Every structure is written in C-alpha cells, then in structure tokens.
UniProtKB/Swiss-Prot annotation:
E.C. numbers: 3.5.3.15
Expression by tissue: Found in wool follicles, keratinizing epithelia of the ruminal mucosa, embryonic hoof and tongue filiform papillae.
Lineage per the UniProt record: Eukaryota, Metazoa, Chordata, Craniata, Vertebrata
Family of the protein in this entry: Belongs to the protein arginine deiminase family.
Species this chain originates from: Ovis aries (Sheep)
Location(s) in or outside the cell: Cytoplasm
Gene: PADI3
Modified how: The N-terminus is blocked.
Protein name listed in UniProt: Protein-arginine deiminase type-3
Length: 664
C-alpha cells in the first residue's frame, strides 16, 4: 500500500488535490485555523467519506455529526472509493471566538479529484490478474499464501536466434510471451488529470538486473508492438496511455534465485504531479507488486518418465539397444546422442540434470548443465535448449571442479516428512567429504544455486571414499505402492557377504563371478570361496560398509526413513588408488522407468542356471510390483567405473504439487 498523503488546506483560497481511490488522505487544518477555535464543522459531497480521529488513544469515527470539538491532536482523514467525474469537495467551517464579537465564519475548501490506479498481477497463483487483493507488498508461501510468480525465460522459442530468450532485448516471436507473466496497469479518472500528471513504472537497479519488462504498445499479433521498457540498464519508464484505462506489460525473469538473490523482484508505479513547470515532480501515490522467480525443481526417479537420453559410442551398440527396448516398454521417447556430437563421452548423467520450472500459467523443463565440461559439454545447449525447453548452468570463475561436480553426484528424494516437517518436493542429495575433513566437495557456485532454490533443501552425504565420488554409486529410489510410496535401494557389502556365505554353506563355493563377460580379456573369474577367503577384500568392505552406514543414518534422519523403507542390495567394492570402485557392476546404479528397472548385469555366481545376485535383487524388488531387466554394461561402462544410470538420463513428469503451496 502507498504511504498516507498529507494535504494542507488554507483559509485564503480553495485547495485542490488529487487522491487515489481507496487510499486515505490526511487533511492538515491546523496551520490555517483561527486562533481560539474550539469547534469546527466539516461537510463532504456524496462519495467523499470523512473520518475524525479525536486522539491517538481513540479509534477514528465517521464524520456523520457535522460539528466537532477542535483538538490539536485530532486527525482528519478523507477517503474516496471511486474515480471522480466532477470535482468533489470537502468544506471546513471554523466559528470565530469570542462569540460576543461575531464575524463571518472562516472557511477552508478542499477540491478533490479522485483517480483509481492499480498495478495488478496474478497474486493468488490462479492464472489471472487480481485487482481486489490487498497486501501486494508481501510474498507469502503456503496454501493460503499469495504473491505472483515469474519464470526465468531461459528457453529459445525463436529458431532464428542462437541465444536464450532472456539474452534478447526484443520479443522475437509471439510464443515467447507465453513464458512471461502479465502485469496490468489500470487507471480510471478524468482524462484531463493526465495533462499535468504522469505515471512512472520503476524498479531498483538490482532488480533491473534480474527481470525485464515489455510494454504492449500496439497490435497484439505484432512482435514489434512489445517495447522493452524496464530491465538491465532501464530502471524507470514514463507510461503513455496508449489504451486509456488499461496498459499491459509482460515480465520475464533473467536470473534464478542464487547467493545474494532471494528470488524476489519488485515493481512500482508512481503517480507524479507535474503541474508546476518551475518545480520538480512531486509523488502522490505509489502502488507496488512483488514477484518471486520460480525455482529450478528436480524430479526424483519415482516420477513417471517422459524421455530417455543415451549416447551412442563405438562399443555400446548392444547397450543402446537394451535401453531403447526398456524405454519402449515404459512408453518413453528415446533420444540418442550420436558419437559425432558426444565425441565418445558416454556419461550423459554426469553432464546434465533435467528438471523444470513452473508458474500458474506455464510449466516447462529446464536442463541444468554441470561444470564438468567433458566432450559432451555442448550437447545441453546446442541440442536440448529450444522451444519450451530451458537451460541453466553454474561454473566457478577459476574453473576449479572435481569429479564431485558431475551430476551423477546430484539426486533428489521423493516427497518425505522428516522431523515433523514436510518436504512435498523431496530433498536434493549430493555428496562431499566428512564435516571438518579435507577432501573433495561440490563447487561453491553449484552448492549456492541448489540451496537458493529453497523448495528442495539439500542434504550432503559422504562420498569422498569413492573413486568417482557420486551418490548414485550407493543409492537409488524406486516406486512402491505401499508405505511412503517408494523404497531406497542401498548398496550393502554386508548383504553380499551374507548371500555368498549362504551359497557356500549350501555347497556352491565353487560358483564363479564374471563368467560370460564378453569382449574383455582383463577380467578373471573368481569363485565365491575365493571372495570369502580374501582377507583384504573383506577388510576393505568393512570400511566401505561403515561409510555407507554413516550415510544410512543421515538419510534416515534427514528424509524421515525407517529401516523398512531401505532395501539392502548386495554389492562389493574394491580399492583402487586408495578409493573404492565397484567389484562387480554396481546394482544400485540403475535406470528407473516407472515399474521398469534397467539394472547393471552383475555377472554373479551362476547356481542352478541362475545368477544368484540377479535372483536376490529380483526377490527384493519384484514384490513391489517392479520388473527387473539386467543390462550388460560391463565393457562399455563398468570397466570405466560407471554403470547404467551413469550412461543414461531421464526427463520426468513434473510434480502435481505446486511449489508455491509449500512452506520452506
């Protein structure tokens, strides 16, 4: 709401003033009151409401009675609720004192011209511009909250442009307007008022760097009609009244929430009195709206899949075919990045994370490009960015990145409740070192970005013990029809040793791992008994289990998980250069497409014609209604310290829950 305006009246001549509908105007009569005045009378024409507040301690009263005791502490407030057609008046009469020497009454006359001015936007997140809402200065989270939403216009609707839309000062195609939020300036009042008054739309210099405004100045079907009026180097704009009572503006975000930017952007419209050529303009009224830039939102593997991405390289034809078949069963679109574009970089999960942004009027996917910058670095920008598909990235200025900055180290949980707090969009998970220890961590610019989105508060896990150092090496999430609606498969050396011990007990100690591996001469078979007699392997996996157990407790605490929500998947690790890598293909590093799971084929011990590791995983996951498909990734991925999840990526359906309804 605008600050209360003060108007001073005079006994010498009538006073003229402009007021805004619904906004209080404080009338100062004290400077003109005859000395000794004890009473006064006040009259308002129809449509003018006058209120008297006798003192600070007492509530104001409507001036129904015409005569009032005069007190220097009294306040006189005038309100009009509809625009003027003619000048309305308020008249003050001051009887002179002493009464035995009567003189003519003293009069003060106030002529009022009322104008209605509102700056409106979609404050209730209902897809319409609401002019009846009161508190536009606050942006309030929650199901009963309010405030308008702004999308970062980070897609590329115009195929004639090589840049994202927010890099352009022009509207290149009309589809671009669909990504913007509408802001409407409504004015009602005598046309003559605007001969010596003007309206100025303005924002702060900081907010001008974070949003851009276009004014619709002509035919709606012409791109040239949309004039860039605010944003970047433009902080104010005198609004011409092209359309009389209603001017439409289109607003686009330029920056996602980040360190130093909460996501809030504010715009004001101010009515200025420009009637005196000898003086500068004076403000009469300001209306304000606040937008929040929509956060980038990740989707967990439990969300329905829409599109699967995979790279074709020189030795993974069978792998690509297997992923294509799984995508077909799941009803997903398949996008294959050819070798000419990936230049033999197969790690498409590490290159990017697919999420989305949402406003009441529009939702579209946004790819977050990692700072790893391998041979795939151009793929997200050149091949994914396009109409209604946005792009974002964060890179440290000194280019100091580690393996932990690849996005295999970036996951998100399904919706959870932890410690009495709801996380309806889940929580982001990424890995680092132990608190207070030296080691690899996710680069600060990425951490700042993820924390600033607010709606999926991050949890940091301990992954520095892993050679690659990604959270997807030790956990995943799969959908379930009971409980919390999901399970968390977690790598477990203890479960693997227990399984092997059972098989050895039943006389299968000679069963071999790695039988049937095709196309690689570096792998020697090893029996169950050899594994169970390898003291260094057992000792190292006890250490690995302790690291996983640390994460297990963090996840139980931060995600509100119980033991029944965790599925222990048998998995062993070995040491290379003092870090852990998977001993056999990492079973939790899976591709989740609804009920269809693409799991790395472990080449485990074959007993009675069946791989005992595959059989165990099926027994754990298929009762949940899931279908397990084991994909041979041994040579093209496992031998390079990656698996199925590392070599694929998935665009998923956005949450049905609206982010502005949550309470961070």
């Amino acid at each position: 709401m605008s600050l209360q305006r003060i108007v001073r009246v005079s006994l010498e001549h009538p006073t003229s003033a402009v007021c805004v509908a619904g906004v209080e105007t404080l009338v100062d009569v004290y400077g003109s009151v005859p000395e000794g005045t004890e009473m006064f009378e006040v009259y308002g024409t129809p449509g003018v409401d006058v209120y008297i507040c006798p003192s600070v301690e007492r509530d104001r009263e409507r001036a129904v009675a015409r005569r009032w005791h005069f007190d220097m502490g009294s306040q006189i407030v005038v309100v009009m609720n509809s625009p003027s057609n003619v000048n309305d008046t308020v008249t003050f009469k001051f009887p002179t004192i002493p009464a035995e020497t009567p003189r003519p009454l003293a009069y003060a006359v106030l002529y009022l011209t009322c104008v209605d001015i509102t700056l409106d936007c979609d404050l209730n997140c209902e897809g319409r511009q609401d002019r009846d809402f009161v508190d536009k200065l606050q942006w309030v989270w929650g199901p009963s909250g309010h405030g308008a939403v702004l999308l970062v216009n980070c897609d590329r609707d115009s195929m004639s442009s090589n840049d994202q839309e927010h890099c352009d000062h022009h509207v290149r195609c009309l589809q671009d307007l669909e990504d913007m939020s509408v802001m409407i300036l409504r004015t009602q009042g005598p046309d003559a008022l605007f001969d010596d008054h003007k309206l100025v739309l303005h924002t702060s210099r900081a907010d001008a760097e974070r949003a851009r405004v276009f004014h619709a100045c002509g035919p709606e079907d012409s791109c040239e009609a949309y004039r860039h009026v605010l944003g970047q180097n433009k902080v104010s704009y005198e609004v011409p009244r092209f359309h009389g009572e209603e001017e439409r503006f289109f607003v686009e975000g330029l920056s996602f929430p980040d360190a130093g930017f909460s996501g809030l952007v504010t715009f004001h419209v101010t009515l200025l009195d420009d009637s005196n050529e000898d003086f500068s303009e004076s403000p009469i009224f300001t209306d304000t709206v606040v937008f929040r830039v929509a956060p980038w939102i990740m989707t967990p593997s439990t969300q329905p899949p829409l599109e699967v991405y995979v790279c074709r390289v020189r030795n993974n034809t069978c792998f690509v075919d297997a992923v294509a078949e799984l995508a077909r069963r799941a009803g997903c679109k398949l996008t294959v990045c050819p070798q000419a574009e990936n230049r033999n970089d197969r790690w498409i999960q590490d290159e990017m994370e697919l999420g989305y942004i949402q406003a009441p009027h529009k939702t579209f996917p946004v790819v977050f490009d990692s700072p790893r910058n391998g041979e795939l670095q151009n793929f997200p920008y050149k091949r994914i960015l396009g109409p209604d598909f946005g792009y974002a990235t964060r890179e440290p200025r000194d280019n100091s990145v580690s393996g932990l900055d690849s996005f295999g180290n970036l996951e998100v949980s399904p919706p959870v409740v932890a410690n009495g707090k709801e996380y309806p969009l889940g929580r982001i998970l990424f890995g680092g070192n132990l608190p207070g220890s030296r080691g690899r961590r996710v680069t600060q610019v990425v951490r700042d970005f993820l924390h600033a989105q607010k709606v999926q508060p991050p949890v940091e896990l301990f992954v520095d013990w892993l050679a690659v150092g990604h959270v997807d090496e030790c956990l995943s999430f799969v959908p379930a029809t009971d409980g919390k609606g999901f399970r968390m498969p977690l790598a477990s050396p203890s479960a693997c040793f227990k399984l092997f011990q059972e098989k050895q007990k039943w006389g299968h100690g000679g069963a071999l791992l790695f039988q049937g591996v095709i196309g690689n001469q570096q792998v020697n078979t090893v029996s169950i008994s050899q594994v169970l007699s390898n003291g260094s392997l057992i000792g190292y996996n006890k250490f690995v289990q302790s690291c996983i157990d640390w994460n297990r407790e963090v996840l139980k605490r931060e995600l509100g998980l119980a033991e029944r929500d965790i599925v222990d998947i048998p998995q062993l690790f070995k040491m290379e250069r003092r870090k852990a890598v998977a001993f056999f293909p990492d079973l939790v590093n899976m591709l989740v497409l609804g009920k269809h799971l693409g799991i790395p084929k472990p080449f485990g011990p074959v007993i009675n014609g069946r791989c005992c590791l595959e059989e165990k995983v099926r027994s754990l996951l298929e009762p949940l209604g899931l279908r397990c498909t084991f994909i041979d990734d041994f040579t093209p991925y496992h031998m390079l310290h990656g698996e199925v999840h590392c070599g694929t990526n998935v665009r998923r359906q956005p949450f049905s829950f609206k982010w502005w309804c949550m309470e961070p």
